């Protein structure tokens, strides 16, 4: 059985030679150089991912939704009843939630994973990786033990890698859990060094008169637990949650296979910050789908050095933004593989020479 450290060491670097070849190929297509903007850069990034073997393409698509409850809900940081987590997870098995509709539209399968729902019995139809019935209340204790965090990371990494073996080449991450923007804000504040007041938002429509309490809860959680910002596992274990750990595991698992993973919203940014502390190499495999409307979103993305492709003012979570952006990935692959070449039409654009086109 591989350890977490073993798996982290398997994450390959992006192939710069493959990216250079892709750049030359794209520059020779039937268009002015650079005229397809970020689609070109995206195709080149995909070409460099070893799991795609130098040719941008999309096989099977999967959105993995990590579902868990949070002890910090007890602090009054969310207005939705805690039971909504289990109810919505069950709705996902019926295909009726936002992510399910958008994933179906994109031709992706949704994998709903119970990593910590607070229900008496497992919910039929969910993938059962439950660690406990909800995480600890981070305002008064750690979210979980380091051992629990490492085991869940390893389990999710292995599950993700198994999906890759079965033909999935594009992953999306999502989550479900009442009060989970509170631990996400704690992670973002810890790793970026920004004050909780700068990153704590309203989540699922928290009334503004309750925002000060939420900020105070995040500040207390960080002060009490003292997470080490350089240690992603420590941050997740002390002020995170099982859903956040699970998302980090998907990112690490996809990257270990040399495959892309679409981020979703604020929760996924927090998980990505922690995952990048464990393995900086994974950042090259992360594709930011959209800009979350949550307050700390720009701070988290700026720290990651990522620019989102969409700005739809969304803050649903669930993996909805990741599913929505999947056609953009397919479009980048399509231009790379299906457009004609300048040389074949005897077109020489200013700045190009015949030898350039034939190289």
From Swiss-Prot:
Catalyzes the synthesis of alpha-ribazole-5'-phosphate from nicotinate mononucleotide (NAMN) and 5,6-dimethylbenzimidazole (DMB). It comes from Escherichia coli (strain 55989 / EAEC). CDD domains: DMB-PRT_CobT (cd02439). It comes from the Bacteria. SUPFAM superfamilies: Nicotinate mononucleotide:5,6-dimethylbenzimidazole phosphoribosyltransferase (CobT). One of its GO terms (molecular function) is nicotinate-nucleotide-dimethylbenzimidazole phosphoribosyltransferase activity. The keyword Transferase applies. NCBIfam families: cobT_DBIPRT, PRK00105.1. Belongs to the CobT family. Keywords: Cobalamin biosynthesis, Glycosyltransferase, Transferase. Pfam families: DBI_PRT. Pathway: Nucleoside biosynthesis; alpha-ribazole biosynthesis; alpha-ribazole from 5,6-dimethylbenzimidazole: step 1/2. Its EC number is 2.4.2.21. It is an enzyme of class 2 (transferase). It catalyses: 5,6-dimethylbenzimidazole + nicotinate beta-D-ribonucleotide = alpha-ribazole 5'-phosphate + nicotinate + H(+). The active site is at 318 (proton acceptor). The lineage of its organism: Bacteria, Pseudomonadati, Pseudomonadota, Gammaproteobacteria, Enterobacterales. GO terms for biological process: cobalamin biosynthetic process. InterPro entries: Nict_dMeBzImd_PRibTrfase, Nict_dMeBzImd_PRibTrfase_bact, Nict_dMeBzImd_PRibTrfase_N, Nict_dMeBzImd_PRibTrfase_sf. This is Nicotinate-nucleotide--dimethylbenzimidazole phosphoribosyltransferase. Homodimer.
